[in-house]
Amino acid sequence: MVQQAESLEAESNLPREALDTEEGEFMACSPVALDESDPDWCKTASGHIKRPMNAFMVWSKIERRKIMEQSPDMHNAEISKRLGKRWKMLKDSEKIPFIREAERLRLKHMADYPDYKYRPRKKPKMDPSAKPSASQSPEKSAAGGGGGSAGGGAGGAKTSKGSSKKCGKLKAPAAAGAKAGAGKAAQSGDYGGAGDDYVLGSLRVSGSGGGGAGKTVKCVFLDEDDDDDDDDDELQLQIKQEPDEEDEEPPHQQLLQPPGQQPSQLLRRYNVAKVPASPTLSSSAESPEGASLYDEVRAGATSGAGGGSRLYYSFKNITKQHPPPLAQPALSPASSRSVSTSSSSSSGSSSGSSGEDADDLMFDLSLNFSQSAHSASEQQLGGGAAAGNLSLSLVDKDLDSFSEGSLGSHFEFPDYCTPELSEMIAGDWLEANFSDLVFTY
């Protein structure tokens, strides 16, 4: 510390000619750069009075000169960065002599320039109409919009108050537990005031709980540029409300629900596929309602060979193959279920486009076949597993055919199978070796 103080005194006694002209800018206010006896020792050539140096400036002036002597090509910003890091690493005891020197310079500066007042550099002039709005806080300027140019800060405050009132109106019906209709009414009422200065954006209605009550309306203020998005937000609100209203009344649950078999989450929310019935299905078309379908399925499952009369239609007619005789009793639940599904859906209202019907039928058949394994295994121990596997495999085989069924009945398909493929399909599905299933061309 003593050595630093001595070096500081030695630096202060250096003549001006020994100084570099490049660092004269940093030393214009130091006693080293100018003779302290000169009354203008801290003035620039233009007459601007410089601020007195603080402790860091006193220290960095000395260290900067050392660095510039060692590496004159180093950039000025890099020198400042290194000096800042080194100053932070200095201990407080090492900073004391520089703090004292800075205090001495400050007192001298006050004595020499008693009328000095720190005036920072003025920023570039902005547009005069934008000055009042620039003085507002960001919240007020965002809510007030053009209130700054119209009436200054007071205008911005007024519009922010008015917009908060509007937001309160929106929140009132939501807090009262109103349903989606009340939320829509509040929204349309507030969108009517198109002449207001504020911008109201992104209203969202999110249903809390299971019902439609307790909708919360969020009010978010955006910039002026988002005026065009109001119509989109209104559309988003209606779209988000419609699924909430649909949740209250899931249709056609009682039609598809057998006692203790089908969980409610597997049900579809729209109608069963309306499939036009083919003439060959007239034997089972007498079943009028969906509730009686499951009785027929169970009766067919217990009778075995009796249900086998419908067996030959189910999927084997598509490939023009005769089923193996062992699978006749086992396939009866699946076949009767597929036939009854098509007949019940044909007894509904008029069918829509055939493409949608094919998609719906794919879902219903896959659902029925996956459940036929459970019902069959309960009543037929031996053949139930084979029925489930065979029916599921047949569904996988013919999914592509369902999407093609646009003419006539969905069950009248052309034969797309090659003889080799038909032979494999008609054969045993449970192969002993996996290598038998691999195709080699």
Swiss-Prot record:
The highest taxon in the source lineage is: Eukaryota
Cite the record's Gly residues compositional bias ranges. Answer: 143-156
Impact when changing residue 50 to N: In IDDMOH; decreased function in positive regulation of DNA-templated transcription; compared to the wild-type, the mutant induces a severely reduced GDF5 promoter activation using an in vitro reporter system
Q: Which Gene3D superfamilies match?
A: High mobility group box domain
Q: Which gene encodes it?
A: SOX11
Q: Where in the cell is it found?
A: Nucleus
Q: What is the effect of changing residue 176 to E?
A: In IDDMOH; uncertain significance
- Report any Pfam family annotated for this entry: HMG_box
Residues bearing Phosphoserine are 206
Result of changing residue 48 to D: In IDDMOH; uncertain significance
Please list the residue ranges the record marks as binding DNA. 49-117
User: One GO cellular component from the entry?
Assistant: chromatin
Write the record's keywords in alphabetical order, separated by commas.
Activator, Developmental protein, Differentiation, Disease variant, DNA-binding, Intellectual disability, Neurogenesis, Nucleus, Phosphoprotein, Transcription, Transcription regulation
Q: Which organism is it from?
A: Homo sapiens
Could you tell me where the Low complexity compositional bias lies? 170-186, 252-267, 328-355
UniProt region (Disordered), positions on chain? 1-21, 116-216, 240-292, 319-359
Q: Which disease is it linked to?
A: Intellectual developmental disorder with microcephaly and with or without ocular malformations or hypogonadotropic hypogonadism: An autosomal dominant disorder characterized by developmental delay, impaired intellectual development and microcephaly. Affected individuals may also have oculomotor apraxia, ocular malformations including coloboma, lens abnormalities and microphthalmia, and hypogonadotropic hypogonadism. Some patients may have finger clinodactyly and hypoplastic distal phalanges with nail hypoplasia, especially of the fifth digits.
Q: In which tissues is it expressed?
A: Expressed primarily in the brain and heart, with low expression in the kidney, pancreas and muscle.
Effect ascribed to mutating residue 113 to H: In IDDMOH; decreased function in positive regulation of DNA-templated transcription; compared to the wild-type, the mutant induces reduced GDF5 promoter activation using an in vitro reporter system; no effect on nuclear localization
| Lineage of source species | Eukaryota, Metazoa, Chordata, Craniata, Vertebrata
Q: What is this protein called?
A: Transcription factor SOX-11
Altering residue 142 to G: what's the impact? In IDDMOH; uncertain significance; no effect on nuclear localization
| Mutagenesis / variant outcome for changing residue 60 to P | In IDDMOH; decreases transcriptional activity
BP-aspect Gene Ontology terms? brain development; camera-type eye morphogenesis; closure of optic fissure; cornea development in camera-type eye; embryonic digestive tract morphogenesis; embryonic skeletal system morphogenesis; eyelid development in camera-type eye; glial cell proliferation
